Curated annotation (Swiss-Prot):
GO molecular function ontology, one term from the record: toxin activity
Domain of life: Eukaryota
Swiss-Prot/TrEMBL keywords: Amidation, G-protein coupled receptor impairing toxin, Secreted, Toxin
General function of this protein: Causes constriction on isolated rat ileum preparations and relaxation on rat duodenum muscle preparations at amounts higher than bradykinin. Is a partial agonist bradykinin receptor B2 (BDKRB2). Is moderately lethal to honeybees. May be related to the predation of insects by the spider webs.
Lineage of the species this protein comes from: Eukaryota, Metazoa, Ecdysozoa, Arthropoda, Chelicerata
Protein name listed in UniProt: Nephilakinin-1
Family recorded in the similarity comment: Belongs to the bradykinin-related peptide family.
GO CC terms: extracellular region
Subcellular location: Secreted
Length: 10
């Protein structure tokens, strides 16, 4: 993703 730690699949 664009940000480290951002997960669209949670």
């Amino acid at each position: 993703g664009p940000n480290p730690g951002f997960s669209p699949f949670r």
